[in-house]
Amino acid sequence: MEQLKLTEQDLINAVCLFHAKFKSVRPEEVEVELSFDDDAGYGAEACINGSCDLYNTTNFITAIRLYIDEQLGKDSISARIVLDIEDEMVAHVSW
């Protein structure tokens, strides 16, 4: 079984790329803050020029899948993605 660990910076990049694609802007224009809440779970807030959108866990995972597909060149459909907080937020990906 192949395994991969995505760092917090990888997760931020994933949301930046996903949000930029969705909003038709450059990734450099997107600011991202990751979050975790006991009730809401993992998420992110992505902002462009002060206009912010919240990503729930499902949308966050979708952004990570796109990152795996487009940036890492791996098939994300069959990947198991587990978010965790160690020293920072990470994603453990396995196929």
Residue spans for each PLM region:
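Protein-protein interaction and targeting regions used for scaffolding, dimerization, and localization
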Residues: 1-95
